[in-house]
């Protein structure tokens, strides 16, 4: 009994310390599809062949643990949607699910919690901004393939009377400027700054803002501008820093790590 009470006291005190030291800002970085095979390949890619020891990489220094990633369906390998739903909400679901459970009911995401708490919210991705991973933080849909519906969610859904995402940087003009609806104009009407020119991204001076720099996904880093994600991340943090006394939440995805894997292109993946 004494051991149990001591453990309870320890947990309670730890909870108190954690509550007192909760971070003001949250930066959530995701390498889509980036399993152990990628980090191993990167270790060999970066290694100095003139030494006998395989040198550790930055990923080796920050590794804190691993988790099972199987979805809640009859398959063994997760997809980006089920994986991102688990990461954003803590709920396992079926492959293709966008922040819904196995009954296709919405589950609350950490971005939505942040918005409810008055924080500024942001999504940055090298895919279209309504692709599976970013979508699973700010939308709810039974299928990741419903790209138009997901894009609509970003302006139709309200959290505490406000749009869910204050800053979005990525691709996706194909889904935002359509024959049936022009979401870009709707975002502008809602007070968002807008840019579709990556070279002019710095013209975005404040949030809310929307930057769509490709029709679908951005060019692969191997082919064009290898620092594009770094530049978008830097811009996002510049816009978010100090903007809100309650802090910010931003999800940043290296989307095309996964796309290179699907293509079985090791050079693309390491780029």
Describe the residue ranges of each PLM region.
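Gram-negative bacterial Sec-dependent N-terminal signal peptides
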Residues: 1-19
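N-terminal catalytic scaffold of extracellular/periplasmic and nuclease hydrolases
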Residues: 20-177, 182-201
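Beta-strand elements within well-structured catalytic alpha/beta cores of enzymes
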Residues: 24-34, 114, 212, 247-258
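Cysteine endopeptidase catalytic domains of the caspase/legumain-like
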Residues: 108, 220-226, 233, 238-243
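Active-site His/acidic residue clusters
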Residues: 132-138, 216-224, 244-271
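Phosphate/oxyanion-binding active-site loops and adjacent basic polyanion-contact surfaces
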Residues: 143-147, 225-233, 268-271
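Formylglycine-dependent
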Residues: 154-158, 205-209, 213-219, 224
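Active-site regions of oxyanion-processing enzymes, predominantly non-cytosolic
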Residues: 163-167, 187, 195-197, 201-212, ...
């Amino acid at each position: 009994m004494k051991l149990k009470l001591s453990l309870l006291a320890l947990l309670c005190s730890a909870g108190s310390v954690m509550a007192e030291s909760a971070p003001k800002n949250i930066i959530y970085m995701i390498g889509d599809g980036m399993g152990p095979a990628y980090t191993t390949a990167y270790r060999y890619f970066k290694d100095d062949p003139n030494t006998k020891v395989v040198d550790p990489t930055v990923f080796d220094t920050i590794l804190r643990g691993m988790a099972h990633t199987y979805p809640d369906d009859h398959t063994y390998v997760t997809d980006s949607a089920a994986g991102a739903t688990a990461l954003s909400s803590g709920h396992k679901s079926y492959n293709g699910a966008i922040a819904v459970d196995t009954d296709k009911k919405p589950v609350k995401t950490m971005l939505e919690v942040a918005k409810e708490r008055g924080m500024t919210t942001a999504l940055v991705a090298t895919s279209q901004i309504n692709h599976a991973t970013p979508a699973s933080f700010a939308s709810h849909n039974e299928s990741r393939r419903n790209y138009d519906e997901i894009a609509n969610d970003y302006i139709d859904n309200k959290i505490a009377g406000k749009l869910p995402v204050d800053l979005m940087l990525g691709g996706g003009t194909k889904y935002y400027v359509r024959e049936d609806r022009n979401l870009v104009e709707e975002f502008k009407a809602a007070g968002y700054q807008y840019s579709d020119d990556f070279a002019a991204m710095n013209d975005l001076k404040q949030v809310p803002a929307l930057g769509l720099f490709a029709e679908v996904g951005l060019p692969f880093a191997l082919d064009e501008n290898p620092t594009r994600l770094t530049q978008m991340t830097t811009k996002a943090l510049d816009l978010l820093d100090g903007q809100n006394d309650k802090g910010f939440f931003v999800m940043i995805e290296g989307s095309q790590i996964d796309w290179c894997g699907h293509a079985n292109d090791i050079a693309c993946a390491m780029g």
